[in-house]
Design a protein with these regions (language model features):
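Extracellular beta-strand-rich solenoid/capping regions of secreted or surface-exposed proteins
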Residues: 75, 79-80, 96-110, 118-145, ...
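Right-handed parallel beta-helix/beta-solenoid
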Residues: 39-72, 500-503
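Glycine-rich beta-solenoid repeat tracts in large extracellular/virion proteins
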Residues: 101-104, 126-136, 157, 179-185, ...
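Feature marks extracellular polysaccharide-active and adherence modules
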Residues: 87, 112-114, 120, 130-131, ...
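Predominantly extracellular beta-rich ligand-binding scaffolds that present long acidic/polar faces
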Residues: 220-221, 301-305, 323, 350-369, ...
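Surface beta-loop-beta hairpin patches that serve as ligand-binding interfaces in beta-rich domains
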Residues: 41-50, 508-547
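Acidic Gly/Asp/Thr-rich repetitive segments characteristic of extracellular carbohydrate-active
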Residues: 61-85, 525
Length: 547
């Protein structure tokens, strides 16, 4: 039975010291003080889908001194007009909020901190709220930019305890989502904003969004923003329910989904009263940084973003996405997923996305008991120019990917699987991919993906896929000397001579082949550019993610 979040759901790497720029930013996050208003922005990789809102004619908070920038002055400015800026002096200033700033959902509001303002909830109150009563109709809302939101706390009002004698029933908080911002049926545009140490309630099957929670909204777009140290039962940083989401050039680090049990409806939970609906089980724990649920929403897009060191207790260490029966599209482009962890799906859990498009991205050093990098269920998977390196399934199957019911319209092209592991002893195998592949695999390399059960299929555990111009290494299993399962019918066995994961140009780290690698000039019909954005040799391209 599949995990869910929301109203209607069912169901040993060497890492180069030359770190990706976004990771270097991430290392600085923990040292920033609460008074520092805006952390270093992530690198700009993708064209932003929105620009900062204009601030002409603003109502100004303050008269040039920190003492003039008070909570009452802020509330007066918000009440007086739709555009708010600040004049608190040259130094960073913090405005402590003692109650939630409630904004009108039908009037466009702009709040611009100028890079020096922090709203701080002291771990006691949600910071901002805007609620419209309808479902996906309202296009007005909030543009928030150049500011920090810290220590916000969503406080629940209804807790459902565990059911005596039925551990499968759901329990936890029925409300208490959105520690910094709560939005319903309203637009939210976020540009260059830092979210730190905000929290939603936990546990609970449907509460979430330690920093941001948005329900039934047509447009949530987050650009050039950082999320560090946020937590909630689901979606440690962001929770979207029936909401269209766009993420560009964002950094998510050290966020946690702290719920304690996978969510499901029916089956083992039959007879439960449920926290949010009848026959519901579980208490959350999905989506360490981001959780997205819905069938009414549109496509979800992530571009140029970095997810590092996020954790979840259940599914999707970085991001959890279920599209319910509507099979909405999900895309990841030029993004990095590194050192995330979960019980299942160390980086991603994605269900019923058609298509699920992954382009020019890197998944490295993610860990889970099963599906070290990604657990993909019922998706039409389309992967191009992507690297899976050093991901680990610690007690199960699929060191990099675990696939269930993948659609025939999918493909894997010009992709590198290297150094992934399925550890945990006997019964652990499929270090690169576990599951059925019903689509072609072309110009792809499977190199040194190792399983603890050395006598079982090491790299791929499924009936061989179709395809062409693929390379696999090694050929022999370490125990028994048998030939390993082929990942693709007719695959060539050769040592690809790949280097360690490193910054080789482009927005994401890659593993480049040596000058005399058999991957060079061995591919055909490759993507026009490689993972770094470098043009490929059209006649004789290189197998794998890097030309």
């Amino acid at each position: 039975m599949s995990p869910h979040f929301g109203l209607k759901s069912t169901v040993a790497l060497r890492i180069c010291r030359d770190l990706h720029p976004a990771l270097r930013v991430g290392l600085l996050l923990g040292a920033a003080s609460a008074a520092a208003s805006v952390l270093a922005a992530p690198p700009t990789v993708c064209t932003a889908p929105i620009a900062p809102a204009a601030t002409a004619g603003a109502h100004v908070v303050g008269n040039g001194t920190p003492a003039s920038c008070t909570e009452s002055a802020l509330r007066a400015a918000v009440s007086a007009g739709s555009v708010v800026t600040f004049d608190c002096g040259a130094a960073p200033a913090t405005i402590a909020l003692t109650s939630t700033l409630v904004l009108p959902a039908t009037r466009p509001t702009v709040i611009d901190g100028g890079g020096r303002i922090t709203f701080d909830g002291g771990g006691r109150v949600r910071l901002i709220e805007l609620v419209h009563p309808d479902f996906r109709t309202n296009r007005a809302g909030l543009s928030l930019q150049h500011i920090t939101l810290a220590n916000g706390k969503a406080v629940g009002t209804r807790y459902v305890p565990p059911t005596p004698g039925n551990a499968s029933c759901s329990f936890g908080w029925a409300d208490g989502a959105g520690g910094a911002i709560y939005v319903r049926d309203a637009m939210l545009h976020v540009v260059d904003v830092s979210f730190r140490n905000n929290a939603a309630e936990t546990p609970g099957p449907d509460v979430g969004g330690g920093a941001i929670y948005a329900a039934a909204s047509l447009d949530v777009t987050i650009v050039g923003s950082t999320f560090d140290g946020n937590s909630g039962a689901n979606g440690g940083a962001v929770g979207l329910l029936q909401t269209d989401g766009r993420f560009a050039n964002d950094l998510f680090s050290n966020n946690k989904a702290t719920g304690t049990g996978a969510n499901y409806v029916g089956g083992a939970a039959a007879g439960c009263g449920g926290v949010a609906q009848a026959n519901q089980g579980g208490s959350g724990g999905n989506g360490g940084a981001v959780v997205i649920d819905g069938g009414a929403d549109g496509a979800q897009n992530v571009c140029g973003s970095t997810f590092t060191s996020n954790t979840s207790n259940e599914f999707g260490g970085a991001l959890f996405r279920t599209a319910d029966g509507a099979a909405q599209a999900t895309s990841f482009d030029r993004s990095l997923f590194q050192n995330n962890a979960a019980r299942t799906g160390g980086a991603l859990y994605v269900q019923n996305s058609k298509p699920l498009v992954i382009t020019a991205s890197t998944f490295s050093a993610n860990r889970a008991t099963g599906a070290g990098a990604g657990d993909f269920v019922g998706d039409t998977l389309q992967v191009t120019n992507t690297t899976f390196a050093g991901n680990v399934a610690t007690k199960g199957l699929g060191g990099a990917l675990f696939l269930v019911n993948s659609g025939a319209a999918g493909w894997i092209n010009n992709t590198t699987f290297t150094g992934n592991q399925s550890s945990g002893g006997p019964g652990s195998f499929g270090a690169a991919v576990f599951g059925t592949l019903d689509f072609p695999i072309t110009n792809t390399v499977f190199a040194n993906n190792l399983s603890a059960d050395g006598g079982s299929p090491m790299q791929c555990s499924f009936s061989p896929g179709s395809g062409a111009n693929d390379v696999q290494w090694p050929q022999k299993r370490p125990v028994g000397g048998l030939n390993d399962n082929v990942c693709v019918t007719g695959i060539r066995f050769a040592d690809p001579q790949l280097g360690a994961l490193a910054a080789n140009g482009g927005p994401t780290p890659t593993a480049t082949p040596a000058w005399n690698s058999p991957l060079r000039k061995a591919g055909h019909n490759c993507a026009a550019t490689d993972q770094r954005g470098v043009a490929r040799n059209a006649a004789q391209c290189t197998i794998g993610a890097v030309e």
